Structures are given as structure tokens and as C-alpha cells.
Amino acid sequence: MNTFDINAQKREKIVIWLAKFGFSTRDLLSKMLGVNVDGQGAFFKKLVESGITKEEYVPGTRKRVITLTPDGGQQARIYQPDLEVKSLRKFPLHTLIHSYSIQSFLTTQKGVKDFFSETELAKRKFIRRPDLLIVNDAGVKIAIEVELTQKDVNRVYFNFYGHVQDWQQERIDHVIYLFSSPTVLARYEELYQKNPWPKFITTDGNVRHMSRSGSVDPSHAHTHGLMYFHKFEPYAL
């Protein structure tokens, strides 16, 4: 494969990645490509000069945020006509850290056949839409949840039950929760191992309107090994 073909392949991967996640950084995109970011300056500059991407600094960060231009969005639809292109005009720091952490985790995974961002999953009928869905080479569907803060216990159980329902409807096979805090990890794992779980439902999809509705026996989820809980290092701005 010559240099032109290699760069064309890299450009396609970057455009699709940005369409899925909305934004990224040079170092994350380089990790995704499996190359050293230090040698990619000319390549990223060419993407900007070609009108495919734009780069801007966000206050409070050390790195430029890379997004698709409108022409870049059109390019993404050429690569994948059914792709829902995500675009943001503002970049709150918590949104950057959360998304970058998801992307960083994804770049470390081997044997990924396909993946779907939260934006793509919005078109599917998930009870509990995860942050990321990975399909591995064996066809196993793994939901990824990045928890950078401790949610209310009722909300945790509401999400747990949603995962169980999605598993029962064959939308997912497993869930991996990722935590920056070992204390929060231990708390979630403790809640998961309990039996029964308090059951919470909502009639309008709004978690602020959820109410207690009896209990649920999670033993089938425990036996299957539905959920796993791991410590990880979030992306550092």
C-alpha cells in the first residue's frame, strides 16, 4: 500500500470516528490509528487545510479539540450513508472528560469488530442506553458504562434493571462498568451482588420521575455474569 492509500485509509477512519463521537484529540486519534502522534503533525494539518476538520482550544484544556466541518460531515455520509453525524458547538469540561475517557478505553481494546457510540445507539430501542457498545470478533455485544461520579442508589438500580431488560431482549450480552474511584466501584459491586434489587420504573422515560415498583430477582443476571466492574484511569485534560 502506497502513502496515498495509507493516508486515505487514515482519513476515512478519522472522519468516521469524529462523526460517531463528535470530537476528539490528536493523541486519541493517533492511538486509534495505532501510530505515534509525534509523527502526525503534517497529516492533521492537511485535514484542516482540506476543510475536513477544524481544531480549536477550549479554556481549561491543554489540547485542541478536533471536530468535523460541514464538508467533513458530508464526507462521513459518503463513507457510511446511514451514519448519524454528531456535532457540538460547546464543549463543557465534564463532557470532554467523559467522552475522551470512553474513546481512550476503546483505543486499548483488541478484537473489536464494530462499535457504536451513544449517539448511534439513540436510534435503537435500549431501555438503558450505554455510553458505548462494542461488538467483538466473536459477535459478543458488550455495553460500556463510564462512571466518573457516584449516582444515587435508586438511579443505580434503575440502570441495573434497564441493563437486565436489554440483555433479556438480546440487545447486549454483558455490561462493563468503568470507575476512576475504587470506592465507587466497590459500592456499585456491592449493590449489584444484593438479592433482591429494589425495582424502579418510569412511565415517561424521565429518571426524575421514577418510582418504586416492588423488587426484582437478579439471580439469573448473576449466574450469567451480566455485569463486570473495573478500575480505569480517565482521560486527563
What do the PLM-derived regions correspond to, one by one?
Residues 1-20, 158, 168-174, 179-237:
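Non-catalytic C-terminal interaction segments of nucleic acid-processing enzymes
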Residues 1-88:
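Nuclease-adjacent, charged terminal/linker segments that flank catalytic cores
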Residues 33-38, 123-125, 152-153, 184:
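Acidic-and-aromatic substrate-binding clefts and catalytic sites of carbohydrate-active enzymes
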Residues 80-123:
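Acidic-basic catalytic patches of nuclease active cores, encompassing PD-(D/E)XK
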Residues 106-142, 150-152:
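Active-site metal-binding core of divalent-cation-utilizing nuclease and nuclease-like domains
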Residues 135, 162-169:
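Short, basic/hydrophobic alpha-helical segments
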Residues 150-161:
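Active-site-adjacent loop/helix micro-motif of nuclease/hydrolase catalytic cores
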